[in-house]
């Protein structure tokens, strides 16, 4: 879309990839333009031409050395588990439906064991991973709601399917 809008080859670099079925909020990306453009016009154009399931909330000009992936401070995954007796058909694409009672206190205890720097190779969906599988989890928060349990994983990065497997 940017190449079509600007008439120049534009490579977009995201701060990370998402697994299939994962929705990203606050995903950061960067790109370089040879000629400066009005950020408001770029933002309007992007939201006009991008697929309907992608929206750009803001666009900011930054230093040319900025790299969205290598300068990300942390990333947070939210994993939602629907625990109600009746499936939520409206949220089915966004939550995991699990109607067996869960022990939230034990989940919190187990989460504490995962904090810190560890080799998460056993929790990676890609068995042929060539890069380091060592990651640091800074926080795991388990929140209980009326018919849903939300798990928030904050770390320096995540492996393919790591959060889904940990959950």
Regions found by a protein language model. Name each.
Residues 1-167:
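Structured-RNA-binding interfaces characteristic of tRNA pseudouridine synthases
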């Amino acid at each position: 879309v940017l190449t079509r809008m600007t008439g120049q080859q534009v490579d977009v670099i995201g701060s990370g990839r998402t697994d299939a079925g994962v929705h990203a909020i606050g995903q950061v990306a960067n790109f370089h333009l040879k000629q400066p453009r009005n950020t408001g016009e770029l933002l309007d154009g992007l939201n006009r031409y991008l697929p309907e399931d992608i929206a750009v909330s803001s666009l900011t000009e930054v230093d040319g050395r900025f790299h969205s992936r290598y300068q990300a401070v942390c990333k947070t995954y939210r994993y939602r588990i629907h625990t109600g007796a009746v499936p939520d058909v409206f949220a089915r694409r966004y939550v995991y439906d699990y109607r067996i009672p869960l022990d939230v206190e034990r989940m919190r205890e187990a989460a504490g064991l995962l904090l810190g720097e560890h080799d998460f190779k056993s929790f990676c969906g890609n068995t042929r991973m060539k890069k380091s599988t060592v990651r640091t989890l800074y926080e795991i928060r388990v929140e209980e709601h009326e018919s849903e349990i939300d798990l928030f994983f904050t770390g320096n990065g995540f492996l393919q399917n790591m959060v889904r497997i940990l959950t």
